[in-house]
Amino acid sequence: MKKQELISFLEEFAPKQYAEHWDNVGFLLGKKEEELSKVYVCLDVQRRSVEEAIAHSCNFILSHHPFIFQGMKSVTGDNEQGRLLLTLAEHKISVFSMHTNFDSVKEGMGDLICSKLSWKKEGVLQEVSPGLEGISQGIGFYTRVDKAFSCEELAAYVKEKAALPYIEYFDSGKPIRKIAVCPGSGKSFMKDVIALGADAYITGDLGHHDAVDALGEGLSLLNAGHYGLERFFVPYMSEQIRRHFPKIDCVEEEEFFVGKIL
């Protein structure tokens, strides 16, 4: 099987036009006409993931976050990105990334996390294009729950459902029924969430001033970390590939929370 066959499947699963204008998704490194051996699926292309891909004889890496994001003027061994690119090329390992396009499509990140939390999606935070067959497509989602949570109860619920080692929460003191979620880094949608009338917002990469501003608007915040919710991309896309290509072996990145809390 050629790499092109897998690339075509991935491009159909999460079309490039659903990506944000600033994003860099798709086939980023390699030759499409080469034979595919094994696929390594990860969140980020970093030293440990490249070494694991080599150790497992994988010649194709599927990542969520794009490895090549901003313009590069040279590829040398003087920095880590250059060293990794040279290593990947030396071992003929291709790289394909599905980022905000995966976040936006039906059966992508939003639906995945909504299912993981056992909720029903009512809509998205930012529509990317008109929904197909009446289904809203876009980044993030919001839902309503029948029984109100306290902020502490919601934090405990999300921590258990998402198997998180830790979660940070900022309590407005209001009962929580309408909940907005954006896996990864969603602080840019804070105003949209407030305008939506949400009682709580679950996302990652939140800081002190984000919390102060949100609490002032009566919005509770849950900081699940950037990796906390997005890490489910790895087993989910591995399963999608196995389902469509039963003869292709997928190696999944082991869970690795970069940050540690004492």
Predicted regions and their residues:
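Active-site catalytic microenvironments in core metabolic enzymes, especially phosphate/sugar-handling
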Residues: 1-262
